[in-house]
Amino acid sequence: MDLSHETYLHGGYIGTPEVAETPITTEVDEEANVVYVSRHMDDAECPPFYANSTGIEGRITRWQDVEYHAPCLYLLHSRIAPVGVLPPEEGPDDEAFHVEVTYAITPETEHSTHDFWMVARDFALGDEKVTEYLATNNHTVVMQDVVALNILEEVVESEKENYQELSINIDTGGLAARRILKKLVEAGETVAE
């Protein structure tokens, strides 16, 4: 749920210092089983991924709005614009570039998961060079995540029983998602009985 890892894991692609430095806001709709996490960076470095695909030079206003729909749908709405360009109160947000990322996370076993992903954009739609650039770099970023997640899986497996994880404010979205998943599992177990 938290994208601050972009700063450390995806430098040179989508990560910049501002991602980790900017606080998040988290909202939870317990009834709908949805978690919303937002990070709005008003003055951020433009990472190569966006500079090369949008043509923006200099600093940007960058928004990351995540929706997690339990149990398995993750949506990332990214807004990128020249620094200071905010969306209008009404009407289309024509001065910004928008990228939509969808992950459909499907567990296979206790230790393996299928992660189906897709990326859409509202700019340079007819530009094959931009399409190829985004496809190649999105794949690189996802594969960086796969490497990190495999290492994390090994770390979790090596933890002693009753290991107490330390959670901090940046984990509120992930903790809310875990809470909802636990509720859904318990409800399923009740139905199965």
Roles of regions detected by a PLM:
Residues 1-193:
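C-terminal catalytic domain of Rieske-type non-heme iron oxygenases
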